[in-house]
């Protein structure tokens, strides 16, 4: 089942007042899920939407964002198992819009919002202030499963490190990218 944001909610030059999906779409999902428990939701949206309020009605959720002209065949390949999904979230999905630090300064004055979060934008805010989130920055699943062992990190310079690990694919699925490493440079804010 495809769900997403209507064109009126996707724009430059104004901010959305909510991260919620349209109520009519949630009602449709609930009606379909009441008849068939094997519902997979494919999201089509240009910005974050909350999924916690309705995720219980879906066996799976695939965020496709706003696909381009070749998006349909690529999405079909993922849905039918020809390729394994490998995308990672480029942002954090909070449980509620009020969990996001940008709401402190919103709606601003006369259409202008003061971006006062400083370096505490996105995951930095949630990590620093130990805020629970629905899906963290970098989250992503695959049809493949892995076993990771012998993880080692060695500082090699002021701002460099060497990281190694043994990653074993424990499934019959070949993923495009088996492993990702993210590190944080500790610095004063």
Residue map of PLM features:
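Short, glycine/acidic-rich beta->alpha junctions
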Residues: 20-24, 70-71
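Secreted, periplasmic, or luminal enzymes acting at the cell surface/secretory milieu
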Residues: 44-176, 180-184
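A cross-domain feature marking catalytic cores of carbohydrate-active enzymes
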Residues: 3, 43
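Glycine/threonine-rich flexible loop motifs
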Residues: 5-22
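Alpha-helical scaffolding segments of alpha/beta enzyme cores, especially the outer helices
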Residues: 24-34
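Active/binding-pocket-proximal capping segment
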Residues: 9, 18, 180-188
């Amino acid at each position: 089942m495809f769900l997403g944001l209507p064109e009126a909610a996707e724009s430059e030059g104004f901010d959305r007042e909510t991260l919620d999906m349209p109520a009519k779409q949630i009602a449709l999902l609930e009606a379909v899920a009441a008849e068939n428990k094997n519902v997979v939701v494919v999201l089509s949206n240009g910005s974050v939407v909350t999924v916690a309020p309705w995720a219980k009605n879906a066996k799976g959720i695939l965020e496709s964002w706003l696909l381009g002209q070749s998006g349909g065949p690529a999405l079909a390949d993922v849905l039918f198992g020809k390729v394994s999904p490998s995308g990672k979230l480029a942002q954090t999905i909070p449980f509620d819009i009020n969990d996001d630090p940008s709401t402190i300064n919103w709606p601003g004055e006369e259409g202008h919002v003061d971006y006062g979060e400083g370096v505490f934008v996105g995951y930095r805010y949630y990590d620093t202030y130990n805020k629970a989130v629905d899906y963290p920055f970098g989250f992503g699943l695959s049809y493949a499963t892995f076993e990771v062992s012998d993880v080692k990190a060695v500082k090699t310079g002021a701002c460099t490190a060497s990281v190694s690990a043994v990653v074993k694919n424990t499934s019959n699925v070949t993923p495009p990218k088996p492993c990702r490493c993210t590190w944080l440079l500790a610095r004063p804010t």
